[in-house]
Amino acid sequence: MTRLSALLLSTALCLPAHAQTPGIEKEELTLGFIKLTDMAPLAIAKEKGFFEDEGLSVTLVAQSNWKVLLDGVVSGELDGAHMLAGQPIAASIGYGTKAALVTPFSMDLNGNAITVSNAVWEEMKPNVPMADGKPVHPIKADALKPVIEAYADAGTPFNLGMVFPVSTHNYELRYWLAAGGINPGVYSPDDVSGQIGGEVLISVTPPPQMPATLEAGTILGYAVGEPWNQAAVAKGIGVPVITDADIWKNNPEKVFGLTAEFVDANPQTTLALTKALIRAAIWLDEGDNVNRAEAVEILARSEYVGADAAVIANSMTGTFEFEPGDKRPAPDFNVFFRYNATFPYYSDAVWTLTQMRRWGQIAEAKPDAWYDETAKSVYKPDIYKLAAEALIAEGKATADMFDFDADGYREPTSDFIDGVTYDGKAPNAYIDSLVIGLKGDQTVVGGEVTN
């Protein structure tokens, strides 16, 4: 047992009921976030007093983009932040920024979608099965493939946006395209555009700028979280064609990230933060999402997401609008606690690493053990379990809410749009089972894939 684990365990075992975490090393904290619906656990932990209950005084500060947010955490300007799941993983292996980051808490499942412009949607529609005058969902990228081919024949690039190179959005967009037989391109150490050999050109656009960039014609579609897909519908400029829950059911999305240095220096503060965030997640998913309407009003405020409440409510309250008049039930579009959403599973980290390898961000093949070791260096379920045990001891949660028997790996799943089975304990076999993308010992040299 590490010194940190021993210290946290002694604290958890000694906590009286209804007591804040004792021995807080740092009471005043500044946490960063991006203006997205899935920052909700942070806003709720603050507004419902869960941070305060733990003896924490928290200031939440919106960041302009994911790079600024990451730099803020690494520099210490921010004590922690709402992060893309891929950010602490990529930092740990030195892809982009090199830093030792960890996460004790997964912030949500699902929550993203892929939107295309109205013009592209009209070109896709003849290829989409219909029932009762409405598209049959999920819509596969097969329907987009002939559109992209027509653009290529005309010599016109097909530009798509995503929020960050190591974002779930990037990997979901690429997965969806590849499942439809479209090569999204690969990265190499010498070319980090991710466009080598691609039939589309995928680039970065900050989430709040997605609708305006689409409207300007700079991009023809994008993958992003809410409320920026529903905003395209509200503005009449685009059509979401698929949610990420239909690409991978109950996929991990954001995490709460901290530096390993912060956690080592502030173990009780880290425990307190994790407890408060778990309570916020429980509140968000309580009952049949009974608190979501209140959450929407909080998120709509300018200091948080700052979008129209009706737009945020489209996804947060159990529905999703694909086109005007085509609003469908989507009770699990945003999941904050159920299905063990907050548990930091190693297998979630491993999946991200497999996609980094698939698309060349990890330039060379790695053994299965490397994936396991890397995941365990970043994801910290031991802290999460201690926070959960403390909440149970305080009467703020019950044991049946948590997966205490988990070894850190979810069961293998085939809940992907292409039906391919993912087993986090066999990452190389999984990579090799995917038709498009690097596999085995393949590398990218001089813009060419070599064996």
Predicted regions located by residue number:
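Pocket-lining segment of extracytoplasmic ligand-binding domains
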Residues: N118, P207-F320
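Short alpha-helical interface patches
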Residues: N118-N127, F262, P381-E389
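Short, glycine-/small- and polar/acidic-enriched structural segments
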Residues: Q20-T205, T213-N250, F402
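Repeat-unit-sized solenoid/scaffold elements
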Residues: A178-P208, G236-K254, F336-F337, F343, ...
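Gram-negative bacterial Sec-dependent N-terminal signal peptides
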Residues: M1-A19
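Soluble non-cytosolic domains of exported or imported proteins
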Residues: L36, Q63-K67, H82, V163-T168, ...
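N-terminal hydrophobic or amphipathic helices and topogenic motifs
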Residues: Q20-T59, A141-N159, D326-N451
